[in-house]
């Protein structure tokens, strides 16, 4: 399913004709340039590889420079891939713009969530705190028991414990497109999308729409 690579600009609000305020996230989608077309015969699956934005020349290594030069496209800030459905055809060097979403009502947005560093179980997993008083000493935000005794004699995999929180790939599904601004290459999406301002996001038509 074809999507677009954008950059999260921030949040604002727009008003309907009735005066209702809608909170929106602004996503800037510069033209996505196709750097490679993968086919069933040569690669084992059908997909397009796209790049977006720009990158300083001294930040582009030789492998990337050769790859972009072969495709005849300007080096971008990264490379992303979209699987192709049956019968879809694209040419290397062509561009994808926000107009791809003119007829789309709902989208799924994927980004990298804000990193929170090492966090305890209360913040990371919404554990309840223990008593502040009534004889409780130094165990107010402690997780409590993490298992049983000699049997099984170990902590089960997946046990919710303190650790690194955030900075992981997150997808928010079924967000509504409020406006497509083709002149300024902007998508206005209702609600919040994952990640920090300036972060890369992948916008695709909703799979559950």
Curated annotation (Swiss-Prot):
Residues annotated with N5-methylglutamine modification: 150
SUPFAM superfamilies per the UniProt record, alphabetical: Translation proteins (SSF50447)
GO molecular function, one term: rRNA binding
One GO cellular component term: cytosolic large ribosomal subunit
Keywords: Methylation, Ribonucleoprotein, Ribosomal protein, RNA-binding, rRNA-binding
Signal peptide, first to last residue: none
Matches recorded under Pfam families: Ribosomal_L3
Sections of the chain in a coiled coil: none
InterPro entries: Ribosomal_uL3, Ribosomal_uL3_bac/org-type, Ribosomal_uL3_CS, Transl_B-barrel_sf
Keyword set includes rRNA-binding: yes
Protein's GO biological process: translation
Post-translational events: Methylated by PrmB.
Superkingdom per UniProt: Bacteria
NCBIfam families reported in the protein's UniProt record: L3_bact (TIGR03625)
Family note: Belongs to the universal ribosomal protein uL3 family.
Subunit description: Part of the 50S ribosomal subunit. Forms a cluster with proteins L14 and L19.
Function according to Swiss-Prot or TrEMBL: One of the primary rRNA binding proteins, it binds directly near the 3'-end of the 23S rRNA, where it nucleates assembly of the 50S subunit.
Protein's name according to its UniProt entry: Large ribosomal subunit protein uL3
Taxonomic lineage from the root: Bacteria, Pseudomonadati, Pseudomonadota, Gammaproteobacteria, Vibrionales
Name of the gene this protein is made from: rplC
